[in-house]
């Protein structure tokens, strides 16, 4: 049995060989908020648990998680990096400059998938400037870079939770 995959120009244009640090962070947060019963992840989840708890006190992690219901995630939350040298700062600039129409469309999808969302989070997500607010959530006060897990953020990445200017 042969498998044939056809790839067009648009597919190739959207292909990247660079990992998105914000995508890695989004999924690390999702794992920490709703830990799966996966033995292979248990050591990382235990190591990252305290840092995650601290982050929930420093930043509005609930807003980021609300944009990532099971089986779906808002695209503007973790833009595709232009290349391997793209910084978290570059990506946060992209998040901030998300067109309002795109952000509101993606928020609407997230809201439909979570009809019982907390009223405070719903107000934030449906308000003006949601993309800028999300960029602020990625960079809580503190002026430092720290990871959820020492040298690694996700269970298999080297992405860092950046909290300082120019990170």
Predicted regions and their residues:
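N-terminal, charged low-complexity regulatory/assembly segments
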Residues: 1-167
């Amino acid at each position: 049995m042969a498998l044939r995959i056809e790839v067009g120009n648009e597919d190739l244009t959207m292909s990247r060989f660079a990992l998105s640090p914000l995508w890695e962070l989004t999924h690390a947060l999702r794992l920490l908020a709703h830990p799966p019963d996966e033995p292979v992840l248990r050591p990382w989840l235990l190591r990252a648990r305290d840092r995650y708890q601290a982050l929930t006190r420093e930043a509005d992690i609930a807003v980021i998680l609300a944009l990532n219901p099971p089986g779906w995630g808002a695209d503007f939350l973790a833009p595709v990096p232009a290349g391997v040298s793209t910084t978290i700062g570059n990506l946060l600039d992209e998040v901030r400059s998300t067109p309002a129409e795109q952000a509101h469309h993606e928020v609407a999808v997230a809201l439909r998938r979570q009809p019982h969302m907390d009223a405070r989070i719903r107000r934030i997500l449906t308000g003006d400037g949601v993309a800028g607010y999300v960029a602020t959530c990625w960079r809580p006060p503190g002026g430092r870079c720290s990871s959820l897990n020492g040298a690694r953020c996700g269970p298999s990445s080297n992405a860092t939770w950046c909290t300082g200017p120019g990170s």
